[in-house]
Amino acid sequence: MSPDISTDEVVYPETDGKPLAENSVQCRWITMIAGELFERYNKQPDVFVACDLFWYPVKGNPKIVTAPDALVVFGRPPGDRQSYKLWEENGVPPQVVFEVLSPSNTDEEFVAKLEFYERYGVEEYYVIDPETETCEAFVRDTPDGPLRTVRPAKLNGFVSPRLGVRFVTTDGLTLLTPDGRPFQTREDRVNGLLSQLAGSEAALQQERQRAEQEKQRAE
């Protein structure tokens, strides 16, 4: 890892002015993945989850930066951050990173990000193509080892060592939570909550009717 560069005043930008996604398909995948991770870890005191957050691994050099579509850091507290500065986080890098491809992504960008994540300590790196619903996975077998490719033949049923998320590739790409539930979009979660509320309201109405009938019989 490169040594920190000592400067008195360094500005670390919080945004590059670019949108989160280039199209609705990419946006849906990013928000689905980030939403599920937020939902799962939001009550854990030592897990930080972020979406499209600038990550600066080297103090004093803001040119070394990337913004994963979703990242998970174990061993760091949750909470709002303007960016993720490694030297302010006890040197703990994101262990898991997701990138969702856009039409403008190039092979050069792909290689550069893989090298970045390998150099700065990412343990698991998942690249999802939302158009073809395919995934490339890279994992680190040892702390000092390289990120190796998970062969496509072994990706179906592959389980993330850190997250416990299962990748299913038999019919497109499906991500399953550790309890076997497919990842849900925000709309799926909202509809699920509305359905639960409707069911609760119906049950409450039935209970009211039953109580009223018992009251009438007692009279």
Where are the language model's segments positioned?
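A structured, charge-rich N-terminal accessory region that forms the first stable segment of a protein
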Residues: 22, 27-40, 48
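C-terminal interaction segment
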Residues: 1-22, 36-39, 55-68, 73-120, ...
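A short acidic/basic microdomain associated with nuclease active sites
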Residues: 43-55
